[in-house]
Swiss-Prot record:
Gene: GALT1
Parts of the chain on the Cytoplasmic side: 1-6
Residues glycosylated per entry: 45, 87, 144, 162, 277, 287, 508
Segments on the Lumenal side according to the record's topology features: 24-643
Co-factor(s): Mn(2+)
Protein known as: Beta-1,3-galactosyltransferase GALT1
Family named by the database record: Belongs to the glycosyltransferase 31 family.
GO cellular component terms given for this protein: Golgi apparatus; Golgi membrane
Pathway(s): Protein modification; protein glycosylation
Signal peptide: none
Organism: Arabidopsis thaliana (Mouse-ear cress)
SUBUNIT field: Interacts with GMII.
Record EC number: 2.4.1.-
GO BP terms: Lewis a epitope biosynthetic process; protein glycosylation
Amino acid sequence: MKRFYGGLLVVSMCMFLTVYRYVDLNTPVEKPYITAAASVVVTPNTTLPMEWLRITLPDFMKEARNTQEAISGDDIAVVSGLFVEQNVSKEEREPLLTWNRLESLVDNAQSLVNGVDAIKEAGIVWESLVSAVEAKKLVDVNENQTRKGKEELCPQFLSKMNATEADGSSLKLQIPCGLTQGSSITVIGIPDGLVGSFRIDLTGQPLPGEPDPPIIVHYNVRLLGDKSTEDPVIVQNSWTASQDWGAEERCPKFDPDMNKKVDDLDECNKMVGGEINRTSSTSLQSNTSRGVPVAREASKHEKYFPFKQGFLSVATLRVGTEGMQMTVDGKHITSFAFRDTLEPWLVSEIRITGDFRLISILASGLPTSEESEHVVDLEALKSPTLSPLRPLDLVIGVFSTANNFKRRMAVRRTWMQYDDVRSGRVAVRFFVGLHKSPLVNLELWNEARTYGDVQLMPFVDYYSLISWKTLAICIFGTEVDSAKFIMKTDDDAFVRVDEVLLSLSMTNNTRGLIYGLINSDSQPIRNPDSKWYISYEEWPEEKYPPWAHGPGYIVSRDIAESVGKLFKEGNLKMFKLEDVAMGIWIAELTKHGLEPHYENDGRIISDGCKDGYVVAHYQSPAEMTCLWRKYQETKRSLCCREW
């Protein structure tokens, strides 16, 4: 992240000049994208492969269980639609092989934060996706060809110029497919008006029944101060209808010692609010040695603030790993950690209000998929057909979110090209929840059909629900396919598949195996401000059982099978930290006779890359490509330090 900011001023000015060069200043410009497809409702027709043939009610409707607290009567019909049996083609069935096996999640959705909302929202967007897919098929059949000149569903960038609303009160820029790590929003304008204060809000989509959308990031610039100070201040916050405003984060801070780090950068740059010296020529005096008049410099003390009334500012909000970074005129100013359940993929609109004369706004690095007809190496990227007669040595489940198109393509072009993967000895699947945006879901569906390596989850993706994906990987590796070992990793991790297989063979253990970077002495984080905060209600004990770090760990088939069995019996304790959850599940299985064998491997790097790695985490698509090139050239695990 730090390397990015050194050149940000140059990048910002290039953006400014580029926008002025190519965009008519009098015409708001926005790259077109389709919005109608997902709203089309098609009358069911039994000749269509996605038609619903038979409704199978989930267990919570059949049995007198106390689950109405989780799913209300009004939502039962919507949720039941998730698990309708469908007559689909083999190609369309492939992404849904794990789907119905997770139906029992509905019974205990309330056990995790956002669980109930994730399933209810999934019911709504799934119905919309089915309608959109059927509508597209009708169009293709009627025209007998794919529509030429297809507009992008998820554009890579969007821009507007001088685009305030008619009443001059605000600007709104739609973000159809959310934000992802590396996305940035550059705002060029001038604080003006009587007050010169303004706000930038990144909002999501309102939940059904809620008139106002959640505010994922609220960036409030108060040039004349507020009730707490007369000096200019930046206030960062978030808002939801259920929780109202969160705790304010101010810059400059009242207490500089409370300046925490987000992505290794200060929440508030210490220079904001600090004194700066400026000199001015106030009078002339004679140089006593030469008799020459010279300017006498008088010192003026001012406090630094990045925005100034009447002066042009170039401000950029950039999505990092942990939060949002704000730079102004090339200087890092603030960082804002994403609040619990408010994640960047939820952003659907940017709103700018107040005394701010907008010159331009540019959203770039947006998540977008590659159109299959433009992918030169398409066949080499498709998942190989797996033979039911040949058991797999390893299933690798990759956590990914719906709009992380670029990360998935990077994985397909790099370590998924290992011979062991292409030959069918190892199967790799992305486990992806639904998105709240119909456009993203349609892109995801097309991607899943094209490459055959995506497993869709029957819930909307929230970070608090990732242990549901861990469960899904266990089910896929034992019930959908049959593998000796099951591995979990992330879409920003580079995996040396050959080294993993070699290490597993050297353990000479196929039962009770937990292989990874083992943590045998860790405690729950009790700080509510932490992303990994765990309350005493969630975990009352002082320590966790042994667990393996999430970027890359492996369990043997018997453990994965037992996890699936606990789930079917309703005895699987859900825990929001998925890697710790696996450790908790194994500890529970130990009480019932499992003899665990922990294999620690320090070559699994959970916080970046080190030479000799087996798994390297936090790698961008460009870094993944570089690591693959290094491996092909040297057959060694060498990091790309130049990136």
